[in-house]
Amino acid sequence: MKEIVIQTDKLCKSFSSGGRQQHVLKNLDLSIYKGDFTVIMGASGSGKSTLLYALSGMDKPTLGEVMYGDVKINHLGISDMAVFRRKNCGFVFQQIHLLDNMSVLDNVLACGLLVSRDKKAVAARAKELLGEVGIMKEDWGKFPSQLSGGEAQRVGIVRALINEPAVVFADEPTGALNSAFGEQVL
C-alpha cells in the first residue's frame, strides 16, 4: 500500500466578499500519495491557488483538517508551521523572487542552510541540482538581474528541491521556461 503524504478531511475555505460568504473549497477529502505527481486543474478562479495555500499551510482552512502523516498542520502555531514548511515543502511559483543581493549559488545555499547546517553537503547538492537544470558553474556567481526569466525560474526550482522536500507545490512552474527545459523539469 502506498504511503499517504497529504490528506484532507472535509476541508473548507470561505472568504467574505461584499457582506457575503464565498465558499471556495467545500468538504474536500483528498489523499496525495508518496511518489505521485498530482495535478490540480481548473478554470481561473476555481480555487486551485486557494487549495495550494491550504495544503501547504500558507493559509488556514475555514473548517476541516490538513494532515501530513499524523501531523495536523492547520493546528500548528506560526513558528512551528514555518519550521514544518522549510523541512517538508518546496515551492515553485510562476513569478520567482530571488534575493537580488545574492548570487545564484548563494540564493540556493540560503534555502538549503535553513534546514541543514552541513554547508559542504548543501553546497554539493546545490551544484548538482544547478547542473541538472542547465545552470553551469560559470553562472553560479551571477546575480538575479543578470539572468533571463527562464534561468531565474530554474534557480527557483533548484531552491524548491534543495532540501529534498516530501512535497513540491508548483503553480505554473514552467511558464518562463522554453519547451525543452519545461519538459525536463516536469
Label for each model-derived stretch:
Residues 102-111:
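Short coil-to-helix segment of the ABC ATPase nucleotide-binding domain corresponding to the Q-loop/switch region
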Residues 164:
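Conserved catalytic motifs of ABC-family nucleotide-binding domains
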